[in-house]
Amino acid sequence: MNAIMGMTDIASAHIDTPEKVQDCLRKISLSSQHLLGLINDVLDMSKIESGKMTLAEEVIELPEVMDTIVSIMQSSVKARQQQFDVRLRHIRHEQLCCDSLRLRQVLINVLSNASKFTPPGGTVSFDIEETASENAAKAWFKFTVRDTGIGIKPEFLRDIFKPFTREKDSRIDKTEGSGLGMAISKKIVDLMGGTIEVSSEVGTGTEFTIRLPLPISELELGNFKFPDLKIIVVDDDVIVCEHTTELLRQIGIRSDWETCGQRAVQKVLAAHQAGEPYDAVILDCRMPDQDGVETAAIIRRAISEPLPIILISAYDSADVETKARHAGVNGFMTKPVFMSTLCRALQRYVLGQAAADEQKLSLIHISAP
């Protein structure tokens, strides 16, 4: 409800900016759907207990599902001034078959709890990893949610997946909730043939791990290749750097990475002076030593030749778009960066082509190396 009210206020303040209003309306719609899902928790529990809950099997685009989840979570973590880290590992399949509504329900519930019980300034991290599978028709995914919150007492941890269970603690008495969310999540994960585990330490934080076998869609196509390019990836998170450079490698693009904006500038300038320039720079927006916008501005001042610079942000890029454009940034990507997201950005900002191949790019399957 806070997200709906907040986006409504923002839309009203930008009534003369159609793109901003449209974006707000999209987020209001997503949040409204989530609110309706929460209202239906009691009905879901009733269905589960009577054995009447069934799962739909539909073709889903994993990037779209994750984008919805991240969009919903952004309002919560921003309001609480928390850091929200989303990272991908070894994702080989993006088009899958499952009940997207129930998948979102489980992940949003766990993420919402993580944010709810983490103090301002804390961190919520969300890792999505595709792990090894012995069944060629299914992909195993591991979703890990960690927080630096208040933690869960051992006596409550034992009953966390039981219906109407809420910890009696002065630290959380003012926190709203039905006490059904985790019980429903556990039942849905069971129905999907997966597992959900939790570990916690009071005063340190909590970690949920969800493992799910998701059927691979037969609609996925073969590999997509780009011409010979060299790109540098800059992000203070080593995992993000390794993931993005691995995606680039899989589509035949040479790449380097740096975790520091200042060192990245030095590397870009050195390559340019040596006559072996980079074809593009992919920059994280938020870095501790020198943020992406500042790094882009320094590169632009030093190199006069065209050099595409793409900014990645864990949040809505509209917050920094004007400043970034003035600094010389060409385009934007939102974390987490999937293969299809990366290919579209390279197609548009590096190759300068219209998104004529978006249909093809949305159906990418990358073979395991």
Predicted regions and their residues:
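Short alpha-helical segment of the dimerization/phosphotransfer core of two-component systems
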Residues: 30-35
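Disordered, acidic interdomain junction associated with two-component signaling
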Residues: 79, 87, 139-142, 155, ...
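Helix-loop junction within the histidine kinase core
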Residues: 46-57
